[in-house]
Amino acid sequence: MEKSQGYLELDKSWRHDFLYPLIFQEYIYALAHEQGLNRSILVENTDHDNKYSSLIVKRLITLIYQQNHFLIFDNDSNQNPFWKHNNNLYSQTISEGFVIIVEIPFSPRFVDSLEEKKKILKSNNLRSIHSIFPFLEDQILHLNFVANILIPYPIHLEIVVQSLRYRVKDASSLHLLRFFLFTLNKSISSFSKRNQRFFLFLYNSHVYEYESTFLFLRNKTSHLRSTSSGAFLERIFFYGKIKHLIEVFANDFQAILWLFKDPFMHYVRYQGKSILASKRTSLRMNKWKYYLVNFWQCQFYVWSQPGRVSINQLSNHSLDFLGYLSSVRRNPLAVRSQMLENSFLTDNAIKKFDIIVLLISLIGSLAKAKFCNVLGHPLSKPARADSSDSDIIERFVRICRNLSHYHSGSSKKKSLYRIKYILRLSCARTLARKHKTTVRSFLKRLGSELLEEFLTEDGQVISLIFPRTSSTSWRLYRGGIWYLDITCINDLANHE
């Protein structure tokens, strides 16, 4: 009940464009801490005992606005552990609070908490990451060319703030964000590594701006969610973008609009990359390449080069995104036809959308998480002294099942067997290390209990739906299985 009340307070402040006071609310940091615990099954939460309070946040913000705040970033700051500790403390705390304030109104849990009050109709299937693959299976077989795009980064932090102000109307919050970013400008590299979620939000906000421009040009209507006078100002802003586009491409602006409305164009964005797939010719794809580069440079002041957009033919190229390697391959098929006394043998080629899991990338992610080495040999994980054997086994089994669940769409399951073997043996070595014994003697004492925990397969789940005598479950298990309840990328699949 308290959590739902917190979400309702967030909604009230969000709709009144008054976010700055929320930074001083303790439940904001409780929500941020809870999301950090549940975000990944692989995160080792070593700072789970840290407590946030409004008093700490007030002191940290006061410290930012003090006249001598530059002492924190002085060259001698490394000699003063107190200032170094405060630097890390307030940057981590305030960035988490700011992101959670802006992110929560768009989160599924927030929508669920308001469902009864506002009668919001939701569709969990559309939120699923896996929902894109059935769409690709139906559409990509009819497409010819694909453009792999490396999305350019903004050259200055002020561009990011300017992009965000069309979504966040609270001037105080934007002023704090601007001051916060420029204060940390000298140590932005190390800060971005510690606060990846913060910079990921800023980056997505910036990319959303030019994506919304494309959508606006395509639909010829405003899809913005703002109310009152805000919608009018934003509509003016979008018409200003169109006017600027007309000035840049004065000769062929109508051709550009016709290009944007191409019904055979499909767009997918994943992290810092995006994919444009089309049924048209390579000439049409090169036009897209030209317009995109000029649009980034002229409208969003982002330096880009044509080399960041590569055009390939789908029949000779594989798509690498969301932890899968997707490609269109041709299966030869010979058909014998009989006509009276003559028979004909016809060779046909059937297109098939093939999706596999990159085993090398998965092993690399497991090695980065210290489950194995770079060659795939399992390693033991350090276990806490107060962790029971069942807790350790449950953690490894949860990781294994989540990986199997996420990569269930692969048409080749053998790579998943190797991953399960690594996790199972890593679990056994972790338990043997805790009990100060060998893996062989520990497995002999434990028996088959450890193995049974890892034997829950997706095929067994499907067999509960279909009759055991039917071969449907086996055919489905051998092929791709897409789950429509996956709303985030598994950290092990996120190997980029």
Curated annotation (Swiss-Prot):
Pfam families per record: Intron_maturas2 (PF01348), MatK_N (PF01824)
Family membership noted in the UniProt record: Belongs to the intron maturase 2 family. MatK subfamily.
Protein role: Usually encoded in the trnK tRNA gene intron. Probably assists in splicing its own and other chloroplast group II introns.
GO molecular function: RNA binding
GO cellular-component term (any): chloroplast
Descriptive protein name: Maturase K
Predominant location category: plastid
GO terms (BP aspect): mRNA processing; RNA splicing; tRNA processing
InterPro entries: Domain_X (IPR024937), Maturase_MatK (IPR002866), Maturase_MatK_N (IPR024942)
Localization: Plastid, Chloroplast
Sorted UniProt keywords: Chloroplast, mRNA processing, Plastid, RNA-binding, tRNA processing
Species: Paeonia officinalis
Gene this chain is encoded by: matK
